[in-house]
Amino acid sequence: MKDLTSSDADALIADLGQKARAAAAVLAEASAERKHAALIGAADAILEAEDAILDANAEDMHYAEEKGLSPAMLDRLKLDPARIRAMAEGLRSVAAQADPVGKVLAEWDRPNGLNIRRVATPLGVIGVVYESRPNVTADAAALALKAGNAVILRGGSESLNSSAAIHRALVTGLKQAGLPETAIQMVPTRDREAVAAMLRAQDYIDVIVPRGGKGLVGLVQKEARVPVFAHLEGICHVYADRDADLDKARRVVLNAKTRRTGICGAAECLLIDWQFYTKHGPVLVQDLLDAGVEVRAEGELAKVPGTVPAEPSDFGQEFLDKIIAVKLVDGVEEAIAHIRRHGSGHTESILTENDATAERFFSGLDSAILMRNASTQFADGGEFGMGAEIGIATGKMHARGPVGAEQLTSFKYLVTGDGTIRP
């Protein structure tokens, strides 16, 4: 399917949306056991379909190489037996989580005789738009299903064959569990007009989740008429306080920057308290340099051999590479002010042994995730015990931080009286 007109795309998404709405009504009442069975069946089907998935991925790799995709994008696209096993394990992990649907979030009795319960319910239909990683097909579908939602998946054009092969395995799990095949649907075209149609499909899609780079997320946030769970950038900060433990600080700073530089939880800016620097010298900067990181330093830190003078634009920059901006600050208040000015609301970490300073850092910032003496690379749904995540949300409405199955629910009020009337 090529060169869709706007009306063609709207018709395609409307068809998928109507089927998804019908499936969502069934899923909303599906038992936890049935959803669990579907996820386990899908995990088994993915392993059984390994050869077919690898063949499909080889086609995608050839297509992507001809398109001239970067080595980093090709790596995200590539599947191998280990990555397929990890995908299946991810489905099993989500299956093992507690079912969020029907959970009583709060309950109280009123003097007027009413009993009121607030109970978790599915959102309905979720649209997921993502780029080259075919594993998102499995992760997003699993989390949506666990929370009783139908999902419409639109993967990257370069991963169409891989995603379709994974989707077939997911449908196998649905069928085995007696759930509607249309609970998990894929947009069957590479045409970008289909993405635009999803973003304006308020009648069929309850929330859009983009997974990808700044360009994709920015487009979705700008164009969507449907609510969006997303973060535009992961400009994560680490602040080494004057009361930081040196050994802990060295471990955390190095891990936060270098474990995986291309993820949204990678540290992009290191703030060092003047008193820490006076006591310990440029040890944190030197560790980064020794690890092959390009250190863009401001002021006194720029005198450290091997550093590069920082430009103002380096603070507030998401590098997604072995590059970090560093700066000296005079205490936690200056660190907070810097992060408020340059941060993206994703994840910040303070390194300190001082409880009061840590609490001030936590209260003074409103990022989705705030940490103490821990690497920002832990900003991940799996590490939070969610089984997996569909993304990280930095908005202030509904979901914040890692978006797992629980965050893909809403709630309703169940009110019980006894012939109760209002005077």
Curated annotation (Swiss-Prot):
Record-annotated disulphide pairs? none
> Its Gene Ontology biological processes?
L-proline biosynthetic process
Biological role: Catalyzes the NADPH-dependent reduction of L-glutamate 5-phosphate into L-glutamate 5-semialdehyde and phosphate. The product spontaneously undergoes cyclization to form 1-pyrroline-5-carboxylate.
GO molecular function list: glutamate-5-semialdehyde dehydrogenase activity; NADP binding
Any one cellular component term from GO for this entry?
Answer: cytoplasm
Pfam families in the record: Aldedh (PF00171)
Q: Which reaction does it catalyse?
A: L-glutamate 5-semialdehyde + phosphate + NADP(+) = L-glutamyl 5-phosphate + NADPH + H(+)
Q: Which CDD domains match?
A: ALDH_F18-19_ProA-GPR (cd07079)
Q: Where in the cell is it found?
A: Cytoplasm
Q: Which gene encodes it?
A: proA
**The protein, known as:** Gamma-glutamyl phosphate reductase
Q: In which pathway does it act?
A: Amino-acid biosynthesis; L-proline biosynthesis; L-glutamate 5-semialdehyde from L-glutamate: step 2/2
List, alphabetically, the InterPro entries matched. Ald_DH/histidinol_DH (IPR016161), Ald_DH_C (IPR016163), Ald_DH_N (IPR016162), Aldehyde_DH_dom (IPR015590), G-glutamylP_reductase_CS (IPR020593), Glu-5-SA_DH (IPR012134), GPR_dom (IPR000965)
Q: Which organism was this protein described from?
A: Paracoccus denitrificans (strain Pd 1222)
- Stated family: Belongs to the gamma-glutamyl phosphate reductase family.
- Supply the source organism's classification: Bacteria, Pseudomonadati, Pseudomonadota, Alphaproteobacteria, Rhodobacterales
Listed EC numbers:
1.2.1.41
